[in-house]
Amino acid sequence: ADQWHVVEFPALLDHGPVWPEYWKQDELEKVKATLPVAKWNAQWMQQPTSEEGAILKREWWRIYEDETIPQLHHVIQSYDTAFLKKETADYSAITTWGIFYPDEDSGANLILLDAIKGRYEFPELRRLALDQYKYWQPETVIIEAKASGLPLTYELRKMDIPVVNFTPSKGNDKHARVNAVAPLFESGMIHAPQQKFAEEVIEECAAFPYG
């Protein structure tokens, strides 16, 4: 059989445009702002996502169309942190979720309130975490006990922020954890607003475990 080498040229790299002489950063950002996340990822970033094999399917998310946030009964902030701010490092991610009841007869539902992802040095991550806590005032803050999550836990607890550490048990990898929550998505209990950050989270979920 023929041997093929796949070459990918995403329009934007971590340090800027792949071809800065032709496409400027601000021009690419304008293009990105006009496109759905799925189309931007496929056509410009060489990262198409497929529904086939996806554990969390796009159509399982319920789009929350109201412009105002529903009355929340509990706010949860979740952190998945990386080690270093370098191009080969994983991203650190902060997501904020709210528990609400769509009507009197329904059970608890979950809405994505905010999502931030980037590569941060620890002082940046600490400042960002404090800003996010002050803005959303979550009742529960969950930080995975790995990488920079451990010193971040220590710093936030010094400021009387109620951090709960999460340590996955052996055999309970990310694939298993996603499978465990998939029924919540499939049953229509997970909502997301019509905003860019939510589109990006939905696409990232749809790409798992292959993305």
Positions of the model-derived regions?
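Signature of the SF2 helicase/ATPase Hel1-core->accessory helical subdomain module
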Residues: A1-D14
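Repetitive beta-architecture junctions, highlighting loop-to-beta-strand starts
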Residues: W4, S92, A108-L110, E203
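Hydrophobic residues at beta-strand termini and immediately following loops
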Residues: V7-P10, A115, F166
